[in-house]
């Protein structure tokens, strides 16, 4: 009975001797009074404040800094030199939203909308509010908090116009009114159709671009009050016109297309990118859009099989090599960016990949801002989220060290003042070898990993004894079994961790008698480093233009050239002439003739024995475009190939090798009236805008016959 009473006393003594005592049966605190975090290194937007204190109350930051007064009756956490950073803000997620499936999909075409009283196209869902279909998901919230996020902005990821998103705090044991930060936080757009509806149009990227254009024009017209009918989708679009606007572009060329739409309608889209922004950085820097960047870097390929190695493309290898430098390149080009966890499959990969980006040159301050200040500002929440600042929400993470050190772990994530323990930690490292005298015998207690999942070994002389250990908030509870005394003989200890090498407490010895003890470690254990499998930053290969096979290390520049003694095929009345000279400058022919004097600044090329002809013009081509057909309507005259030029298409290179210099890229023959064509110069390695002929006459594709009837399709 005495053993049971004393053990109960020890346990209760341990509970009421902690820094806090409101709850002890879970990982979250329900404390609404002042809470202080002392001996912390606090990261602020102005730098790290060492040996400082953070005070929070009722879900908000009250004060922070060195030598600040701590109010009476404050719960105090001594962080022992750990770090505090603002919790991260996720701008792109579908947290709490069920993914839609097209359960009633039909192979037959649907040309008319199914929603009466709404927009003429079912894929415009501007009236949809994601919060109406939201259910808090504890499992997903736990994953997000482990990556460092405290707040998520969630949308449905469905439709060309996806409606509005919402913003919630990731707190498990609260109701929705407490979690909710914004029930309508932003509008979302994409180039992808809804999975919920079967309407055929659009079925191409250029169709989606045309649909978005038409939507904005229709909304402008509708807002003038001249419509005789009510359109609930347009009314929602107009009502939400002042919300931040996000665009899920994804594919790298679609990022440029979304940015162009943003400029065209004087909108400031925050655009979700592909992670390959470095490949079209020349175009991106001409716009002023913030880019949401995934960091799901590709894993290294297994190259042990020489047969499979042949399947690897230069594009795949370059992506693996260059992707970690993407954020650095964006920063160097003054392009604002937000880091997203979208695409991350393992929670551990998020911080690991972020650290990889830092090793590849990303500025640490910019890295933190891309997770905190910038996403908060993009959601119009810059006055309450993303900083350690007075009156801001008490959203912060506690880490074991500087965030970007390889060994650092996120220990806790506090969201609106609610504690979530990620990595249970004892703040004092008391690893070492201790000696305790029990019943006249010395027992060696060897403790390791005391700041994580503690390990203990007990030895008497050279004999290892069985033991059981638990650690609760600086209190060590230990049971020692000494079978050499008696099979039923055991001693129990309750020890307070005083410092890094001292423990003291009360115990019950093998004779069931009480005793006090205090012991100091006589040997500090060295922590084994083990094998570090993390890779340092590899050398990043140089970009080519385009960044594919046969890409150029430098974009060709226009030169002034004098070709001498060539055979010219003039395609004029002059016919074919031999031993002629030709001068070109600024991309145009300046002069042809015999024995022309070389002007100053011209490069001379001896073309003796060579033939020079005009470049071949291909009037009917379907190359170098991301989409060719928009078959969702019988007439798709509103779409344009110019919106979907693909400058990376290797067919540009191949056609140049065959003498082709100009092509007209036509819409396909999916419908009687197709889309507008594009006439381009085959400039391999150039930006899209540099490929268009200025002032070229517009053309459109019409078609008849088997393709249009679709008689041989499917």
Question: What would you call each of these model-derived segments?
Answer:
Residues 51, 155, 228-323, 337-338, ...:
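Active-site core of metal-dependent hydrolases
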Residues 19-22, 27-33, 46-87, 102, ...:
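Histidine-rich, glycine-flanked metal-binding segment
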Residues 137-277, 409, 415, 496-502, ...:
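Polyanionic/metal-chelating signatures
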Residues 92, 437-444, 475-547:
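Beta-sheet ligand-binding and adhesion/scaffold domains
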Residues 23-31, 42-53, 66, 348, ...:
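Acidic, glycine-enriched loop/beta-strand segments at the rims
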Residues 37-41, 425-446, 452-461, 467, ...:
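Tryptophan-anchored aromatic micro-motifs
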Residues 25, 108-119, 127, 294-399, ...:
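His/Asp/Glu-enriched, well-ordered alpha-helical/loop segment
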């Amino acid at each position: 009975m005495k053993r049971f009473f004393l053990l109960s006393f020890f346990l209760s003594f341990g509970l009421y001797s902690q820094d806090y005592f409101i709850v002890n049966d879970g990982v979250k605190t329900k404390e609404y009074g002042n809470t202080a975090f002392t001996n912390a290194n606090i990261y602020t937007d102005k730098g790290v404040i060492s040996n400082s204190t953070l005070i929070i109350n009722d879900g908000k930051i009250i004060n922070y800094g060195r030598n600040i007064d701590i109010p009476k009756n404050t719960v105090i956490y001594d962080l022992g030199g750990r770090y505090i950073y603002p919790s991260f803000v996720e701008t792109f997620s579908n947290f709490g939203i069920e993914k839609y499936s097209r359960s009633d999909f039909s192979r037959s075409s649907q040309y008319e909308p199914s929603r009466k009283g709404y927009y003429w196209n079912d894929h415009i869902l501007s009236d949809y509010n994601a919060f109406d279909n939201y259910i808090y998901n504890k499992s997903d919230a736990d994953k997000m908090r482990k990556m460092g996020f405290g707040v998520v902005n969630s949308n449905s990821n469905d439709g060309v116009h996806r409606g509005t998103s919402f913003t919630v705090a990731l707190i498990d044991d609260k109701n929705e009114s407490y979690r909710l930060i914004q029930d309508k936080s932003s509008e979302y757009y994409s180039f992808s159709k809804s999975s919920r509806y079967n309407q055929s149009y659009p079925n191409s990227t250029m169709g989606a671009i045309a649909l978005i254009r038409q939507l904005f024009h229709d909304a402008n017209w509708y807002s003038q009050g001249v419509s005789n009918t009510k359109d609930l989708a347009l009314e929602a679009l107009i009502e939400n016109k002042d919300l931040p606007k996000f665009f899920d572009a994804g594919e790298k060329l679609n990022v440029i297309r979304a940015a162009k739409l943003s400029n065209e309608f004087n909108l400031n889209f925050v655009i979700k990118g592909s992670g390959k922004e470095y490949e079209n950085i020349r175009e991106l820097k001409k716009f002023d859009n913030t880019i949401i960047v995934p960091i799901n870097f590709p894993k290294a390929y297994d190259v042990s099989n020489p047969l499979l190695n042949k399947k690897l493309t230069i594009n795949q290898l370059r992506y693996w090599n260059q992707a970690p430098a993407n954020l650095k390149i964006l920063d160097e080009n003054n392009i604002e960016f937000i880091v997203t966890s979208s695409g991350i499959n393992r929670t551990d990969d998020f911080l690991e990949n972020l650290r990889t980006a830092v090793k590849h040159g990303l500025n640490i301050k910019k890295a933190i801002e891309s997770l905190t200040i910038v996403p908060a500002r993009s959601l119009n929440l810059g006055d309450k989220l993303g900083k350690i600042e007075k009156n801001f929400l008490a959203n912060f993470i506690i880490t074991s060290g500087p965030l970007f050190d390889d060994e650092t772990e996120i220990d806790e994530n506090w969201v609106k003042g609610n504690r979530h323990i990620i990595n249970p930690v004892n703040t004092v490292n008391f690893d070492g070898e201790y000696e305790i005298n029990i019943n006249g015998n010395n027992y060696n207690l060897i403790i390791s990993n005391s700041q994580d999942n503690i390990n203990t070994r007990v030895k008497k002389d050279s004999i290892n004894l069985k033991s059981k250990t638990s650690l609760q908030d600086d209190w060590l509870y230990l049971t020692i079994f000494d079978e050499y005394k008696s099979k039923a003989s055991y001693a129990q200890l309750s020890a307070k961790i005083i410092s890094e090498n001292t423990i003291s407490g009360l115990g019950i010895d093998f004779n069931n008698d009480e005793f006090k003890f205090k012991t100091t470690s006589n040997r500090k254990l060295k922590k084994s480093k083990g094998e570090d499998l993390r890779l340092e930053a590899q050398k990043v290969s140089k970009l080519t233009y385009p960044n594919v096979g046969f890409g150029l290390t430098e974009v060709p520049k226009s030169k002034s050239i004098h070709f001498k003694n060539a055979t010219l095929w003039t395609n004029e009345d002059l016919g074919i002439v031999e031993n002629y000279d030709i001068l070109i400058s600024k991309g145009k022919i300046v002069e042809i003739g015999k024995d022309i004097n070389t002007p100053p600044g011209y490069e001379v090329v001896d073309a003796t024995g060579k033939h020079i002809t005009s470049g071949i013009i291909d009037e009917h081509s379907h190359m170098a475009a991301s989409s060719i057909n928009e078959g969702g309507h019988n007439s798709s005259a509103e779409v344009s190939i110019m919106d979907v030029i693909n400058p990376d298409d290797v067919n540009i290179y191949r056609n140049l090798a065959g003498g082709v210099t100009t092509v007209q890229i036509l819409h396909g023959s999916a419908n009687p009236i197709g889309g507008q064509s594009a006439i381009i110069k085959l400039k391999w390695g150039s930006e899209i805008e540099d490929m268009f002929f200025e002032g070229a006459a517009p053309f459109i594709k019409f078609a008849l016959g088997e393709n249009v009837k679709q008689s041989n399709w499917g």
